Amino acid sequence: MITRRHLLAVAAPAAVVAGCGGGGERADPAERRRGSDIGFLNSAISLERATIAAYRVGEPLLRPAARRRARQIVEQEQEHLRALVEGVRKLRGEPATPKTAEEYRRGFPRLRDQHDVLRFTADLERLQLRKYGDGLPDLFRPDLRQLAASILAVEAEHLSVLLGIAGRPQTPEAFVTGTS
């Protein structure tokens, strides 16, 4: 089971980054909005990078069919990452700094088999669903809301794929909530 410690190791850097860039009390409203959007994007970037790292760490433990699906998911996560980084740069911000592979590995739970990998990556996909779902209304720019909504839909698909590989119902809920 994924512990709070493991999720915090993945999510804490994203939360710190999200708190940055908001500007001071005297910043004009447009600058505060820009800073808020950059903070959200950088938090999402950190979470996407952690998710990609989790799939890569777990890949050797997956059976061939699951490994193929995981690689497809990683390709899509990398596309999300590129779009988010582009969004930060378009706002004249600095994208969040990535961790090393070893830093990610140290923050992850011990993965012993395919079951552990599927459970951990599904937890990360749920975390992403919450991130994008909760952050969507707070984004100021329409193009960023559209990007977040698009990524949200794909993350729901990823979760469905992982649940299917694990032999669980792929649509366990009528609504995507990011919780289990």
Task: Explain the meaning of each model-derived region.
Residues I2, A9-P13, G21-S180:
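All-alpha RGS (Regulator of G-protein Signaling) helical domain and cognate RGS-like helical scaffolds
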